[in-house]
Design a protein with these regions (language model features):
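Generic cytosolic/nucleocytoplasmic N-terminal low-complexity/intrinsically disordered segments
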Residues: 1-2, 271
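Active-site clefts of carbohydrate-active enzymes
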Residues: 250-253, 267
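N-terminal catalytic cores of secreted or lumenal carbohydrate-active enzymes
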Residues: 2-246, 250
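Conserved small/polar residues in nucleotide/adenosyl-binding loops
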Residues: 265-271
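Beta-propeller domains
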Residues: 253-263
Length: 272
């Protein structure tokens, strides 16, 4: 048996780890939202239809932040369809996953869920089929206290206080040909820059996240990041590094070696 020795010195600190790297996300995909975190009428749910068992597990994990509403779903997302009286919300074809979205669970329900879960919100905006103006509007709805059209609309929906969301993701996987509103790196870099700039005019206290390439196997990996940062570096706060690591083959050694891929990503992508 091979042996190794590890020396740990808790006083040797190289930097502070941002707790948000341990965040998660929820998307309108399969049973993730409907039945996963929301199931009205279930014995497992509270008075709002929020699954108590799921909430308990998320609180136990102390998940610091959760991204919503997607994922590929966000590229066709009309946030205004998901707010207001539930019986007035439109059911529409959801083209990312090929289902009908009822909008029974929406933006305000997720804000309530996040409070109960003890998690902050990372809100994603639609840069696939929409753009800067829509991102500005949803920010106004979420973060303005009162006295404007969208802030007063939120108040009319029963939410007097703003949600005060501080972290905003600018689209999702925009280099993927599967994405609604798929863009080239230059196209995405420009719209990300202009969207972030407009949103920060509205609320200078927010932070924004530009989308990196969808994964290591993408032909645009690396060059995508260089190009979009040329366009939006001065306007955004973070770049998301996107890659899924799993162990479907039950090969623990191979799975643990995924850390090498993480290191490769950091070494390959542009750094400052």
């Amino acid at each position: 048996m091979k042996k190794a020795e590890i020396i740990i010195d808790k006083y040797f600190l190289t930097g502070k780890v941002d707790k948000r790297i341990f965040g998660s996300f929820i998307e309108h995909l399969g049973r993730a939202v409907y039945e996963g975190i929301y199931q009205e009428g279930s014995a497992l749910s509270d008075e709002q239809g929020l699954r108590k068992d799921t909430l308990a597990l998320v609180r136990e994990l102390q998940v610091p932040i959760v991204r919503y509403p997607g994922g590929n779903f966000v590229s066709g997302y009309h946030w205004e369809d998901s707010v207001g009286p539930k019986d007035k919300r439109p059911a529409k074809p959801e083209l990312a996953w090929g289902v009908i979205e009822t909008n029974e669970f929406g933006l305000n329900e997720f804000a309530d869920w996040s409070k109960k879960a003890g998690s902050d919100i990372m809100m994603a905006v639609n840069l696939g089929t929409r753009g800067p103006e829509d991102a500005k509007n949803v920010l106004e709805y979420c973060n303005f206290k009162e006295g404007t059209y969208y802030s007063d609309l939120r108040k009319s929906h029963g939410y007097k206080e703003p949600h005060n969301i501080k972290l905003w993701c600018l689209g999702n996987e925009m280099d993927g040909p599967w994405q609604m509103g798929h863009k080239t790196a230059s196209e995405y870099g420009r719209i990300a820059a202009e969207t972030s700039r407009l949103m920060k005019f509205m609320d200078p206290t927010i932070e924004t996240v530009a989308c990196g390439s969808s994964g290591l196997t993408m032909p645009t990996f690396g060059s995508w990041e260089y190009t979009i940062l040329d366009e939006c570096y001065d306007e955004v706060d973070y770049l998301s590094l996107h890659q899924y690591y799993g162990n479907a083959a039950d090969d623990t050694v191979d799975f643990l070696a995924s850390s090498k891929a993480v290191s490769y990503t950091h070494l390959t992508l542009p750094t400052t």
